[in-house]
Structure formats: C-alpha cells, structure tokens
C-alpha cells in the first residue's frame, strides 16, 4: 500500500469527504419535497413569494440601520463622513452574510419547488394559475403564456436557440447534489450529458430570491441566448425576471434593464467589458451593472483557465495612429521571407544528400544543414516530412544540443548564415546581421534597422565637455528621437516577419469581407472584432493586402481572473475540471467536486493510433469514417483548425460521403448542424467542440448500431479539450466510442513528444502506412500535454502576478471614480485631497519661500504661518493649521459660486423649467473654461449647491480619467522594459512591483494637485454687465427635457489580449453603434433679424439688441 493510499484509508479520499459533506443536504431536500408536491399550482408560486419575504426580513434591521445612516449623511461634517461610510460598508457586508444563512435555511424547500415545477411542466402540456401583473406583462411578449380572464395559462413548449423545445426534464438526485455544490461556491464537475444546464436552475433560483441578481456566465453568445430561452420559463413561472445581455447593445438602457433582472445570462467577455465601460462612464445614467453578487460560470475551466491568459482591453485612438510603416516596409519583409525560403530549401536539399553519405564528417555537415533549415522555416512541409523519417529528427536534436552547450555559446555559428531565426516554442523571430544587410540594401544609412545603444550614447553625451546645458539637451532630444524612430521601424519589421512566418490563413485567422478575423483555438469560432496586440494585427492586415487599421491606446483593462474574483460568491460547472483543480484552488480558491453520474458511462475509449506522416493519418481517418457510416453510426470528427476541416471535407466529397462542416466560417448554421449530428450515418466535421455538442441526441436505431463515434484528428495542447470531444459520446449511459488519430508531424508531437515515439517506431521497423497503437504511446502523448499545460499555467500565473499589481491600483482609482460619479462620497474624497495637498506642501519643502509658492500654486492661498513658525513648529501642527484655512477658503469659494449661479438658475427654471432638463454653467480656473452640465431642477431646489457638486464631479472625473490613462500607458511601457532585468539576473516582476509603486504615487499626487488647484480657483466668469451682456446672460445653454442621451462609447474598441506570446493576441470588439452627439440647445427661441426685438422696445431686432450681432 502506497503512502497516499494509506492516508486515504484513514481520512477517506476527496470524493468520499465531498459526499459526506453534501449528501445530508440532498436528504433534507428529499424530506421537504413531499410537502411541496402537495401544493396546487397557485400554492407553489405563493411558496416562492413566502421564501422571498423570509429572506428580505432576515436582514430588515440591518437595512433600516444603513438607510438611516445614509439619510443623515448630509447633516454630518465633511471631515467626519468617512467614519459613517465605513459603518455603512460594514453593514452591507453583514447583510450579505445574513442572506447566505437565510438561503441555507430555505434551500431544501426552494430546491423542492424547482424540482416540482420541472415535473409539472414535463407532465402537463398546460399549467393554469391565477394571473398576476407579471404574467400579464409576459403574455404581451412571450408565446408560451396567454391570459384568459383572471387565469394565466403556461404551456410546456417554447423556442430555445432557434429550435422548438418541449420541456421533458426532472431533476435526478445527482443533480440535486450538483445544485448544492454550486450554491456552496464550488465547481461541479459533471460528465457530458448529465444535465449541467438543468442543475444550474437550482442554485440560480435559490440565489435569485434575494433580489441582488444572479449572473449565469457562458462561453459564447449562442449558449447565453439559448440557455436564457430554454430555462427562462421555469424561473418566470415563479415571478423571477430573466434577461440576456448579449441580446442588447452595449451601453444601452436595454442592457441596463438586463442587469436589473433577477437572473442575467451573458458571455464572460461582455460581463467584463461592461465593467470596464462602467468605469469610463461620465454619468450615473451610463452605468449598467449593479453589485457583483453571485455568478455561475458554465464551462468554468474554459472561462477561468483558457480565457484567463487574455486580458480584456478597451482602447481608443491615439494621436497620429494612422502613421504606420506596415505597408511601406512590407516589400522588404517579402523579399526577406522569399530569400529565406530559397535558403531553407537549399539547406534541406544539402542535408538529404549529405546525411546518406558514408563519411562521418559529411553526415555531421548534413545534420547542421538540416538544423539550419529547421531554424529558417520550421513549418516547411517538406522539412516536416523528412524529419518523420527514421533517425532523422534524433540526429538533428543531437546537433542542436552541440550548439546549445554553455548557454548557446556556439549557436551563432549555426544561425549566422540565415536571414532570420525562428523559435517556435518561444513564439519569437530574430533578425540576423545578414538579414539586416539584405533589407538595408543600398541605403545611405547602414544602421537603418539597427537599434543604437542609447544608454551608452547618453552616458557619452553627459561626459562630453565644452557643451552648454542647452546644447546637451538638444543633442539628447535628437538621440532619443532617432532611437524612437528606429525602434518603431525594427518593431514593425519584427511583427511583419511574425505575420509571414508564424501565422497562417485559415488556421490562426481567416479573411472575410476584407477584414482579418481571429479564430478561437479552443472553440473554432470567429472571435468577432477581436484584434492581436502590439501591431501584430496590423502586420497580418498588411500581409493579406487589406486595409491596415489605425493604432490604439489602452484606456481600461482587466483580466477575467480579477474580474470574477470581485463576486461575493462564485461557482462553476464543467465536464473537465479535475485536471486543473490545483490551479482553480490556487487562484480562485474554488474547490472542484466530482459529481457521480446518474448511469454508468458505456463509451469505449480506444488508445491513440499513431502514424508517421499527416498524409497517412488523414487517409486512415477517411477509411475509418467510411466503415462507421456503413455500420449506420453517426460520426463526429474533431479538428483543430479550419484548414484541416476543409481538407477533410474535400477528401470526403471525393469519396462521395455526405457530411456537414462546423467551423469559424460556417458558425451561423451551428444549431441545425448540431441537431442533426446524431442521425444514423451522419458525418459532422467540427473545429473544436468546446461548449458545442450539448444537443446531440441519439435515436434507438443509432444506439443499437453502437452509438455516436468520436474521431479526433489531432491531440490538442490541453487534455481538457480532448476530454470535451470524447465526452460528446456516451451521454446518459448511451453507447459510443472515441479514438484519436495522431501523426509525428502534428504540432504537439513535433514540438514536445515525437523524438521518443519516432525512435520506438524506427526500432520496430514501421513502414509507411503502418500505425502504432499502445497504452504506452497514449501515456507518452499525455505527458507531452501535461508539459504544455504546466507551461501555460506558468504563463497565466505570471500574468496574474503582473495584473495583481495593477489590480490594487485599479481598485483604488475605480473606487475614487465611483465616489465622484455617484456624488455621495465626493465631498469626503475632496477633503482628503485637500489634507494630502496641505501635508505635502509642508513635508516636501524645506525652504519657506518654496512652501509659500507651492501653497499659492495649488491651493490659491497665502501661507497661514510666518517663516519663524515654519522653522520651529512641528510639521503636523503646520499641516493642521494650513488645512483649516484651506477648508475655510474652499467653503467660502463654493458658497460664492452657488450665489452667482443661483439668480440665473432661478430665472431659467421659473420661466422655462418645464421645457428643459439640464443647464450648462461656464466655470473657469483662470487657465481654461469648463462647461459644467447640471440638472436644472436639482440646482433650483438646492439653491445652486448642485452646481458646486456637478463642478466637483466633472473636474474629478476628468482628472482621474486622464491620469489613469497615462498611468496605464506607463505601466505597459514598464512591463516591456523590465524584461531586460533578467539579463542582470534580477526578477523582472520584482522590479515591476517596485517601479509601479512609484508610478502610482506620482499619479495620486498628480490627481490631488490638479483637482485641488482647479477647485480652489474655480469661479463663474463675471464682469460689470452691459445692456447686451444682460441680454446674453438670459440666453443660458440648457439641455432639452427629453430622455438624456447615453455616453458615446463608439470611439472605443474592446480587446482581448492573449499573453501566451508577449505581443500576442489582443482582440478588439468595436461597438459600432451610432451615438447621437450630445449638443446643448438654447433656452430661448432664435430671433430673426426682422422680428420684433424681445426687449419690448417695438423696434426690429436688427435695429435694437441685434445691432451688433
């Protein structure tokens, strides 16, 4: 007995412990069920209302206390409000904990209600209940509810995902078990076909009873829309509102309403992007999300692991974003790539001749030539075929080891003859001196594509004597400008090289309607609007000859990891999470619980079939398909790229075998193709099946013939994606089979595993067309997959460590921004800013005159102490004294501002208030004019105090947004520059953490300085009014009393950036919605030149007040 088995025998294994914890809950549900089953239809719905009331009342005292504190906040001095808000925050947290206890108490009854409702819908075509207002509202838009008199009739069939669906599901005991796991904030791993979607109805219903909102997160919009339509009626029957954010435009009222629903479905990206958009909003009306309460993530491994490498980014235009060099430098790169192709072919030809020689030296030269050909173009098909021959790859790897010895000391000898060097594993392309010479050509500047040693040049300049400071500064600027230009040129060349050598059309991307669109490697779907980052997308656009889009700058960013960690409670479900249980616990503190299957799995999983070449493999795949079709079985063929799908489709067409293709180019037909995939003799080719096969149902004839047959044409980098493909067969105890066809030329095998298997095949003397099938081989492939998974986990963990630094900063900035936006805590924040500024003025200035100047520049005040006091008093005391005077000045100025604005506000509101909603007030700080928009009614009722609040809010939002945008750019530059620290044996992450603190402190100081300076100087510009000016004062700019326009987000684009490669995959989703420009309109009617003058003089306007117009 091993040590682990010994421990398990004492403490029990993980599954046993989970069962012990969850099973008592299932027993409680089963005990409560008979009482619920006795209720009539109206009684069942009334029970739901009873539970809602019980949960609401459980925290009624705490809610009343929080409301009381909020109501009295205006009577509390600004300096003392922080303590009150801290109390409110504490009570809010207590309410959430009380709700959790109440939910646990009602869980058995709530789960019983859902189960009984599902049972009644499955047994009755119609359910009759007493109509409520909610029923009547639904009946106007939904065809599964109709009203007859005082009765509402609910049907048990409706449209879901484009298909008519009849409800025929009731929860099994194992699904109740899964529901408890999800409610407890854990991950439920359930085999495919065990009804994950139905399981989710239990915790979703229960947690929606609080009214705080439940988010159901899916991997794509098809599933989000389908699940909201499929499960929605079950929730709606009990008066719970359901919506899907993907049905509505971003930043719209409809999307805001979707978030206010009790249950909100949507895709992970859209939830994340909405959060970022909310933190760019300029009015509370622009916000769509409410608090992050509870989320259930479907395909949780795909969302929290696969997508976690890709930060969400909202970017906007940058100055001179159109000035790019991609089209200009493309011909040079094409010449470079063509020259490299000729060279790679020449070396491969040499290698083939020399390797077969009897002379040992010639054989060594042959393998060196082969290694050079591999470094030149590793994806060359002729090279890949030659490497699959007996002993060839092993010989090349030995040669590589020789040149890699002593930290790549001799590697340059092997790579110098090439124009550039490709490293597939590191996703990198490096230009050699020979390559630089080729593209420089006859240029006057031989260093056109060579980056200068800027540090050495600046050091030389500093030590240069005989130059004035001004001359040194001029030379320094010239050096830095030259470096920036060359850096951009070299970067563009590198990105173009990557585009030409490492990214293939119809594999990583497709070109549709003159646009380059990325294909998701996990799902095979087009990632609409996403873009690769760092100029790579523009490079591919230049390569494909389509329009090169303008460059962009990051305005807001977050990783999905940090977004989902904001939820009060998070849980998830998937068919394949156990292999990633460690990562899910490390990063999210989510425990994986494996749910037992309702019926034993009857699928037969066969060992991998390994061939030497892709050609042999695909031939064998077609033959296997032909045999299965003849046996009357449906076949699902999983591929890893669009290109392979199309090639197999052509091969099947030549054999006259009917089939359907499901990939990035044909995803519109998805629902139809998936629905037919279980019919006898049907062949379906699908590019990656993650979250796709949920609808493959089998007929009795198909089950008798052996069920659905799964054929994988290649092993994926992740074992989980392979398990998802296998899991499409053998649902609910159905028969089925799965097998993977692998060749030594596949990317995974080529990069990580094939040398060992190739040597086995060589020793056993395998000929072309023969295949090897053994458990040992399948295990070897699995080890290669583990290697890749570990590497990817490292990347994700590293990304998270970098983003954690930014996340702390983002939390502080977004909290401060939300305070400004909502206005509730803005006064408290401004008081703190003024205090910080006063303390900094005393702390940072050793000289009295400098301190005086600092106070004058930022706080617009004289120093309230003498030079002697400055030298002798304690700094704390001086800061307190300065703060008291600054606050007195600030209050006096804001009161004066309100006094000046009030007569105008009063006049406009009393004369034309019924016509207009907002008014624009011009305020200046002496440097620039700010037009402050303010609600007219609120300004009138508060005697213009609302004008002051709007001024504070507008300035703070403006300063925070500009400073944060600049900080993001600096952090981005810092992340790239610290990577060089590894050459000095330092940890780049550590340097990044230290430097980012300095950047953040500088940003906070800048926000404080700018905000306080503008607020302290802010005033409405007034002068002694002339008759004309008095007339103009009456023409105040106001907004019409129509519904206020929402913020225009159309100039921003959303991106997901894949950090698998430092440059890689930023993607961008353009919100193409046309937004109406928010133009203020005039309060008065426009007076024509020949109309009577409005002053009442009786003269024409052109001869009276219009004389000077």
UniProtKB/Swiss-Prot annotation:
Compositionally biased tracts (Basic residues): 1099-1109
Catalysed transformations (reactions): ATP + H2O + cellular proteinSide 1 = ADP + phosphate + cellular proteinSide 2
Cross-referenced SUPFAM superfamilies: Helical scaffold and wing domains of SecA, P-loop containing nucleoside triphosphate hydrolases, Pre-protein crosslinking domain of SecA
Binding site for Zn(2+): 1093, 1095, 1104-1105
Compositional bias of kind Basic and acidic residues: 1045-1059, 1071-1088
One GO MF term: ATP binding
EC number(s) on file: 7.4.2.8
GO biological process, alphabetically ordered: intracellular protein transmembrane transport; protein import; protein targeting; protein transport by the Sec complex
A Gene Ontology cellular-component term: cytosol
UniProt keyword terms in alphabetical order: ATP-binding, Cell inner membrane, Cell membrane, Cytoplasm, Membrane, Metal-binding, Nucleotide-binding, Protein transport, Translocase, Translocation, Transport, Zinc
PROSITE patterns in the record: SECA (PS01312), SECA_MOTOR_DEAD (PS51196)
Membrane topology reported for the UniProt record: Peripheral membrane protein
Cofactor (UniProt): Zn(2+)
Cellular location(s): Cell inner membrane; Cytoplasm
Binding site for ATP: 175, 193-197, 695
Sequence segments annotated as region (Disordered): 1038-1109
Bound cofactor: record note: May bind 1 zinc ion per subunit.
Subunit structure: Monomer and homodimer. Part of the essential Sec protein translocation apparatus which comprises SecA, SecYEG and auxiliary proteins SecDF. Other proteins may also be involved.
Function: Part of the Sec protein translocase complex. Interacts with the SecYEG preprotein conducting channel. Has a central role in coupling the hydrolysis of ATP to the transfer of proteins into and across the cell membrane, serving as an ATP-driven molecular motor driving the stepwise translocation of polypeptide chains across the membrane.
Similarity field: Belongs to the SecA family.
Protein name per UniProt: Protein translocase subunit SecA
Organism in which the protein naturally occurs: Bacteroides fragilis (strain ATCC 25285 / DSM 2151 / CCUG 4856 / JCM 11019 / LMG 10263 / NCTC 9343 / Onslow / VPI 2553 / EN-2)
Gene giving rise to this polypeptide: secA
